[in-house]
């Protein structure tokens, strides 16, 4: 897929294949093309080049059919603040053609999944940010979709609320729902995704399980060297001379693949490599 906005190439030759029943994470910084990709998968934005098939439906020709089997949780809160949780879910049950006889049960199920039963008759204006986010998820699940698209599902939420959303997403995976999630939170991708595709400048530059990405691009261990700026500059120069992959990590220089270093390695603290190390090694960018 390719998509341009004027001179800006938002998505540049992206190939994506999401198998059923997995949580697939698109990980990248803001501007990597994640949200544009999500909009193309719902036919809100049309690709300039390439073909898109979602759940066996060709887009954009069969986008209406695909949307009936797809749940979408947008990045931005677009809830009607004057309606109650129950009213919003009832409206969307009708829009998604849930049979009349099954609507009440569908609404109750969605409220239960999102842990919003006690707030069923509360208007949206009175809900906390975390509750509103859970309501967005419940709205996307009202019709029992085969595929759920989550665009930055926990952006702007505090850590406790983020954990609650992660538990909800874990429940979707346990139910066999296919989840495609975009995120710029490394911890979120590492925690939730079965497979992670790292995006940069509109392309997928690496793909695999979190553990596979770490092994392939950061190794098993990282050596962190602390000290004054002058010492860190010397360590960076030493790493460059010996071809050791390294990066600045807060007040330290982190050297990848520490398990392979020879006796010339400086003194420092060793730790297991993680997905952040792999991401920075791949892209050269630091993200959350």
Identify what each model region corresponds to.
Residues 50-61, 65-66:
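Conserved ABC transporter NBD signature motif
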Residues 90, 94, 101-119:
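Conserved ABC ATPase "signature" region
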Residues 123-130:
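Conserved ABC ATPase signature
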Residues 144:
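Conserved catalytic motifs of ABC-family nucleotide-binding domains
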Residues 148-151:
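Catalytic Walker B motif of ABC-type/P-loop ATPase nucleotide-binding domains
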Residues 165-256:
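ABC transporter nucleotide-binding domain
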């Amino acid at each position: 897929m390719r998509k341009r906005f004027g001179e800006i190439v938002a998505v540049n030759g992206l190939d994506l294949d999401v198998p059923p029943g997995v949580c697939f994470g698109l990980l990248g910084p803001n501007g990597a093309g994640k949200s544009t990709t999500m909009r193309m998968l719902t036919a809100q934005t049309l690709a300039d080049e390439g073909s898109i098939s979602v759940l066996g439906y060709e887009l954009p020709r069969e986008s209406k059919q695909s949307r009936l089997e797809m749940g979408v949780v947008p990045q931005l809160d677009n809830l009607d603040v004057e309606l109650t949780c129950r009213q919003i879910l009832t409206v969307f049950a009708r829009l998604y053609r849930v049979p009349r006889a099954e609507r009440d049960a569908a609404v109750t199920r969605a409220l239960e999944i999102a842990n919003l039963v006690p707030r069923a008759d509360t208007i949206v204006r009175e809900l906390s940010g975390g509750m509103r986010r859970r309501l967005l998820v419940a709205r996307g699940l009202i019709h029992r979709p085969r595929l759920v698209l989550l665009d930055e599902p926990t952006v702007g939420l505090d850590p406790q609320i983020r954990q609650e959303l992660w538990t909800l997403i874990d429940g979707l995976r346990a139910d066999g729902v296919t989840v495609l999630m975009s995120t710029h939170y490394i911890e979120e991708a590492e925690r939730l995704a079965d497979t992670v595709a790292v995006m940069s400048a509109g392309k997928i530059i690496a793909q695999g399980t979190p553990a596979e990405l770490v092994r392939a691009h950061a190794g098993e261990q990282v050596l962190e060297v602390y000290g004054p700026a002058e010492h860190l500059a010397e360590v960076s120069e030493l790493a460059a001379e010996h071809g050791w992959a390294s990066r600045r990590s807060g007040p330290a220089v982190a050297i990848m693949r520490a398990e392979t270093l020879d006796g010339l390695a400086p003194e420092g603290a060793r730790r297991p490599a993680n997905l952040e190390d792999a991401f920075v090694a791949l892209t050269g960018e630091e993200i959350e």
